[in-house]
Amino acid sequence: SLLQFEMMIMEVAKRSGIFWYSA
């Protein structure tokens, strides 16, 4: 689902130290 995708993006962003993801 879209929610799962968003959560995955946030996980990757945290690990990479990049916060380009915006709700």
From Swiss-Prot:
GO molecular-function terms, A-Z: metal ion binding; phospholipase A2 activity; toxin activity
Give the similarity note.
Belongs to the phospholipase A2 family. Group II subfamily. D49 sub-subfamily.
Tell me which Gene Ontology terms the entry assigns under biological process: lipid catabolic process
Post-translational modification (record): Contains 7 disulfide bonds.
Q: Report the top EC class in one word.
A: hydrolase
Reported cofactor(s): Ca(2+)
What does the note under cofactor report? Answer: Binds 1 Ca(2+) ion.
Function description: Snake venom phospholipase A2 (PLA2) that shows high lipolytic (1200 umol/mg/min) and weak ADP-induced platelet aggregation activities. Also shows weak anticoagulant activity (IC(50) of about 1.0 uM). PLA2 catalyzes the calcium-dependent hydrolysis of the 2-acyl groups in 3-sn-phosphoglycerides.
Q: What is this protein called?
A: Acidic phospholipase A2 CHA-E6b
Q: Which organism is it from?
A: Crotalus horridus
Has the keyword Hydrolase been applied to this entry?
A: yes
Q: Which GO terms describe its cellular component?
A: extracellular region
Question: Any idea where this protein resides?
Answer: Secreted
Q: Which UniProt keywords apply?
A: Blood coagulation cascade inhibiting toxin, Calcium, Disulfide bond, Hemostasis impairing toxin, Hydrolase, Lipid degradation, Lipid metabolism, Metal-binding, Platelet aggregation inhibiting toxin, Secreted, Toxin
Q: Organism's domain of life?
A: Eukaryota
Q: Which reaction does it catalyse?
A: a 1,2-diacyl-sn-glycero-3-phosphocholine + H2O = a 1-acyl-sn-glycero-3-phosphocholine + a fatty acid + H(+)
State which Enzyme Commission number(s) the record gives.
3.1.1.4
Q: What else is known?
A: The subspecies C.h.atricaudatus mentioned in PubMed:20347857 is currently considered invalid. However, since different origins of specimens explain sequence variations, the specimen origins are indicated under strain in the reference section (in PubMed:20347857, South Carolina to C.h.atricaudatus).
Q: In which tissues is it expressed?
A: Expressed by the venom gland.
